[in-house]
Structure formats: structure tokens, C-alpha cells
């Protein structure tokens, strides 16, 4: 019996997990180290009838995410530390309005550009509260 084994990065696995969970809408802005989520979903979402939008910035991505969710879609965006900071006002709006959506935050090491290509746990308190 032969088994097919594949290897994925964590971001690629998260993108495929979102698809399996029924995600049909992604709005994002490419930012390291979360870019692979956008790369995978830009290819795979159209295959399942979903919509992929690359926005002009992180604020626009969060606004589009909330719009997609309000339109009834399972919606996702991905970001990293500085992008999460830019999204705060609209994250607050989404929380107070109880708009169901997913913000996938791939944390960077350091403040914002200390180690921009690697993951860390620097945004835990921001993501938690």
C-alpha cells in the first residue's frame, strides 16, 4: 500500500483549513510572514466559487472582510503585527457589531521590523484582548 505524503507550511495549512471549513471570501493585503495564505487562496477560492480580493491596504482589507461577512459569506483575512495594529478600529467595530469573521494573525518577532520574515508570539496580548 502506498501513501502519498505532502509537506505544507503552517500558513498553507491554515489556508486549506479555511477552505475545508467553508470559507468563500478572502480580503487581504500581502504582508510578511502571512503572504502564503493569500497566495494559496488566490488560486483555490475561485475553484470553489469563492471570491479573493487583494486590497490597497490593511484597513481596506478589514473593511472588506466585514462587508463580506455582513453579506453572508464565511470571511477571512490574514495579517501580521503592523497590519493588526492598523486593523484595530475595524476589529473593534466588528466585535461590537458581532460580525462573524476570522482574522488570521501571523505574529512577527520584534516590534514591527525586527525580524519581519519569521513568526513569534509578540501579538498575543493584542490578539487576546
Task: List the predicted regions and their residue ranges.
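Thiamine diphosphate
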Residues: 1-127
Amino acid at each position: 500500500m502506498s501513501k502519498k505524503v505532502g509537506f505544507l507550511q503552517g500558513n498553507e495549512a491554515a489556508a486549506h483549513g479555511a477552505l475545508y471549513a467553508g470559507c468563500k471570501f478572502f480580503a487581504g493585503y500581502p504582508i510578511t510572514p502571512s503572504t502564503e495564505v493569500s497566495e494559496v487562496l488566490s488560486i483555490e477560492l475561485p475553484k470553489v466559487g469563492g471570491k479573493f480580493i487583494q486590497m490597497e491596504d490593511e484597513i481596506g482589507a478589514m473593511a472588506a472582510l466585514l462587508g463580506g461577512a455582513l453579506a453572508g459569506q464565511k470571511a477571512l483575512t490574514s495579517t501580521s503585527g503592523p497590519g493588526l495594529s492598523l486593523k484595530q478600529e475595524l476589529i473593534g467595530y466588528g466585535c461590537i457589531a458581532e460580525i462573524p469573521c476570522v482574522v488570521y494573525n501571523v505574529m512577527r518577532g520584534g516590534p514591527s521590523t525586527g525580524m519581519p520574515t519569521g513568526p513569534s508570539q509578540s501579538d498575543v496580548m493584542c490578539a487576546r484582548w
